[in-house]
C-alpha cells in the first residue's frame, strides 16, 4: 500500500536488488507496480557487491535484472546499473561523516549512483501556474501547534496564511495554513514538493489519506468516476 502511494508520485525510482541473491519476487512486483502507476524512469543499484566473490556472478544478476525490466516494458538495455554495498558505505560515513569522493570506494559507489540519478532521471516541468492541489498521504498531530497533513503538491503554489479547502470522504471544510515544512520551515511550497502543511482549526480526526487540500472552489467531490484498477493478490 505504501509502495503504491509513493510510486504514484515519483519522477523516477532507484530499484535496489541484492547482487548476492538476484531479483526476488517483490522485485518483480515493484517493477510491475512502477509500470502500472507510471513511474517514468528507473536506475538500478546492485547491493551487497562485497558478498559476491565472482564478477561474472554479478554480471549474471545484472543481465537478469535488465531482462526483467525489458519484460515490463522499461528500456532494460539503457537503464544505468551501479554495483555497490550500502552497508559498507554507511559504516564509512558513520566513521567519518565528512568522507569525500575518492576517499572510500564504497562511498564513491553511492556518489556514482546519485550521478546516474541526476543524469538519467530528468526533472519534469512543474505545473506551478495552476490552482493548488495536494493529495493527503498522512496526518500528524503536533502538541501545541495543531494538525499537519503531509503529501506531494500536485500543482500550484501555497503560502503561509493562505485559505484552503479539505475535500473528499467527509463534508468539505475550510482551513488556514499556519506553517509549511520540508526538512526545514518554508514560506512557500510549489508543485513537486513533498511537504507538511500545518492547518489551523482542523482536528486530526477530520482529515485522512485519500482527501485533498486545494485552493477554495477548484475541487468538488464526485460519487461516480471511471478508473483502471490493478488488483494485487497475496
Swiss-Prot record:
Disulphide bridges, residue numbers: none
One cellular component (GO) term of this entry: mitochondrion
Reaction equation(s) it catalyzes: GTP + H2O = GDP + phosphate + H(+)
Entry keyword Chloroplast: yes
Pfam family, one: GTP_EFTU
Keyword Plastid: yes
A biological-process GO annotation: mitochondrial translational elongation
Residues annotated as binding GTP: 47-50
Lineage top rank: taxon: Eukaryota
Family membership: Belongs to the TRAFAC class translation factor GTPase superfamily. Classic translation factor GTPase family. EF-Tu/EF-1A subfamily.
Physiological role: GTP hydrolase that promotes the GTP-dependent binding of aminoacyl-tRNA to the A-site of ribosomes during protein biosynthesis.
Protein name: Elongation factor Tu, chloroplastic
Organism per entry: Pandorina morum
Highest classification ranks of the organism: Eukaryota, Viridiplantae, Chlorophyta, core chlorophytes, Chlorophyceae
Amino acid at each position: 500500500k505504501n509502495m503504491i502511494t509513493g510510486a504514484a508520485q515519483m519522477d523516477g525510482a532507484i530499484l535496489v536488488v541484492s547482487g548476492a541473491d538476484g531479483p526476488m519476487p517483490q522485485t518483480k512486483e515493484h517493477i510491475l507496480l512502477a509500470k502500472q502507476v507510471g513511474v517514468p524512469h528507473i536506475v538500478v543499484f546492485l547491493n551487497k557487491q562485497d558478498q559476491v566473490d565472482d564478477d561474472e556472478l554479478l554480471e549474471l544478476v545484472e543481465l537478469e535484472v535488465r531482462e526483467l525490466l525489458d519484460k515490463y516494458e522499461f528500456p532494460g538495455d539503457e537503464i544505468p546499473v551501479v554495483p555497490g554495498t550500502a552497508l559498507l558505505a554507511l559504516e564509512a560515513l558513520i566513521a567519518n561523516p565528512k568522507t569525500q569522493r575518492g576517499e572510500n570506494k564504497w562511498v564513491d559507489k553511492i556518489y556514482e549512483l546519485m550521478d546516474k540519478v541526476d543524469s538519467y532521471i530528468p526533472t519534469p516541468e512543474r505545473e506551478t501556474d495552476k490552482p493548488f492541489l495536494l493529495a493527503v498521504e498522512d496526518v500528524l498531530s503536533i502538541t501545541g501547534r495543531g494538525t499537519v497533513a503531509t503529501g506531494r503538491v500536485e500543482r500550484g503554489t501555497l503560502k503561509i496564511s493562505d485559505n484552503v479547502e479539505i475535500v473528499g470522504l467527509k463534508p468539505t471544510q475550510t482551513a488556514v495554513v499556519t506553517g509549511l515544512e520540508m526538512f526545514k520551515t518554508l514560506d512557500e511550497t510549489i508543485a513537486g514538493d513533498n511537504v507538511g502543511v500545518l492547518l489551523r482549526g482542523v482536528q486530526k480526526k477530520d482529515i485522512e489519506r485519500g482527501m485533498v487540500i486545494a485552493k477554495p472552489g477548484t475541487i468538488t467531490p464526485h460519487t461516480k468516476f471511471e478508473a483502471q484498477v490493478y488488483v494485487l493478490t497475496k
